[in-house]
C-alpha cells in the first residue's frame, strides 16, 4: 500500500492527513484558515515535529491570502505545540522572508512554504540513508512513538530508517512501544510499517526492559522534538526510560535529529519547555473512563534524555557522536532551504 502524504497544498487551502482517525480511516482535513491549522496542530490531527513545522508555514500562507495579521498568526501557531523546535524554525524562516514584509506577497510566501516542504523531504531522505548505514545486517530495532513518513513531509526519521533498512535487507524486525497515552506506536507506527510490509510487534511501554534483558533488541532508534546545544534530547515521554535501560544492557541508543530539530540557543534540556496535555488523555480513552473516578493524572507530553545516554545523533549532515556541544556548534544550521 502506498502511504498517503502528511499534507498537501491545493493552491487556496491546506489538506492535512487526520492522524487522529488512523488506522481505521484515511481522511484529510480541508483547512482554509490559519486558525484551523493551529487547532489541527494543538489537537494532534497532524503530528511529528517536521510535519507540524511545514503545516504551520502553510498556515502563514493562509493568513496572508486572507490579508490577516501575520504577527498574530505566527504567534498563535508557535504556541500550538511549545516543545517541538521545528515549529518555530519554520515560522521564523517564513516570517523573515522578503515576501512577509509589507506589502505582503502571498504567492511569495507560498513559494517559501513549498521550499520548506521540499527541504524536509531532502533532509529526511539523507538522514535515513545515514541511519541505515549504522545498523548491522539482521538488526532488531526498538522504536518509541511515531516518526514515520506521515510525521514529516518526506520519508520519516527513525521509522524511516527502519523502513528503508528493511527494504535494503538490514532490519529484520521492529519492536514498537505502544506509546501511552495517545498510542502513536500502536496506531500510527504499526499501521505505517504494516503498509510497507515491515515485520513488527507492538509492546506495552513497560515491556521494553524485559525485551532488552532477553537480548531481543540490537538497537534503540527514536526521533526527537528538540536537541539542545549540549546534546540533551526532548522526545516523547518514555524516551528517557528507554535510554536508561538501553545503557544498562549495552544497547546503542540512536536519536534521529534533522537540523530543523536542533536548537543551539537552548543550553541544555532543563531549559526546554515541556508541554503538558489534558489529564483526560490518561484517564479516558475514546470517551470511556479508564481511571478511578476522581483520580488525578499528570500528562507531560515529552521528557528529556541527557546527552550522555545518546550513543549518536543521526542527522542529514552525518552521524554525530559525543562530545556533542562542539559538533553541534559546527553544523551549518543557518542555511536557508
From Swiss-Prot:
Record's protein name: Methylthioribose-1-phosphate isomerase
Reaction(s) the record says it catalyses: 5-(methylsulfanyl)-alpha-D-ribose 1-phosphate = 5-(methylsulfanyl)-D-ribulose 1-phosphate
Catalytic residues of the enzyme: 225 (proton donor)
Domain of life assignment: Bacteria
Binding locations of substrate: 47-49, 81, 184, 235-236
UniProt-listed NCBIfam families: eIF-2B_rel, PRK05720.1, salvage_mtnA
GO MF annotations, alphabetized: S-methyl-5-thioribose-1-phosphate isomerase activity
Source organism phylogeny: Bacteria, Bacillati, Cyanobacteriota, Cyanophyceae, Synechococcales
Keywords assigned by UniProt, alphabetized: Amino-acid biosynthesis, Isomerase, Methionine biosynthesis
Gene that specifies this protein: mtnA
Similarity field: Belongs to the eIF-2B alpha/beta/delta subunits family. MtnA subfamily.
EC number(s) recorded for this UniProt protein: 5.3.1.23
InterPro entries according to UniProt: IF-2B-related, IF-M1Pi, IF_2B-like_C, Initiation_fac_2B_a/b/d, M1Pi_N, NagB/RpiA_transferase-like
UniProt xrefs under PANTHER family: METHYLTHIORIBOSE-1-PHOSPHATE ISOMERASE
Function of the protein: Catalyzes the interconversion of methylthioribose-1-phosphate (MTR-1-P) into methylthioribulose-1-phosphate (MTRu-1-P).
UniProt-annotated site: Transition state stabilizer, residues: 145
Major enzyme class: isomerase
Recorded metabolic or biological pathway in which this protein acts: Amino-acid biosynthesis; L-methionine biosynthesis via salvage pathway; L-methionine from S-methyl-5-thio-alpha-D-ribose 1-phosphate: step 1/6
GO biological process: L-methionine salvage from methylthioadenosine
